[in-house]
Amino acid sequence: MAVSQSSYRGCLLGLAVGDAMGYTVDNRSWQEIQEDYGPNGLLGYDLVNGYADVTSYTQLAAFTCNGLLFGLTRGQMLGKMAPFIKYVGMSSREWAASQRPWGRPTRNYCWLLRKAELCRRHCMDTRMLDTLSRPALGLSLIHI
């Protein structure tokens, strides 16, 4: 179990570091990056007022973690839990709802919805939002 936890932590840390460093050069060519940052490209964080911006990838990763922790907590506290995909799906739907123009979900399990920077509308990919908003997210994986 410790190896799995370490792998998950490493994956999430890598995502956070990569997102914090890379969001400023996302969808830009190498030439454009060199023009702005020099011949070696981006070598560190491009901070605004001392902070890296929170992007849709950061938001989605945080909500995914919230789902995993919610499932683990439920399992520890109540001695029963559904497969993780159920909790991750629930958290993903709540994040997707926070990205819609009409606002937040009516029922929320994610305390992250109280953090404005984690609900700021970043994601304009309607296909992804539609997919994550479906109530059956993860059900096909459970019934295999």
Task: Name these PLM-found stretches.
Residues 1-142:
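Structured, active/binding-site neighborhoods that engage oxygen-rich ligands
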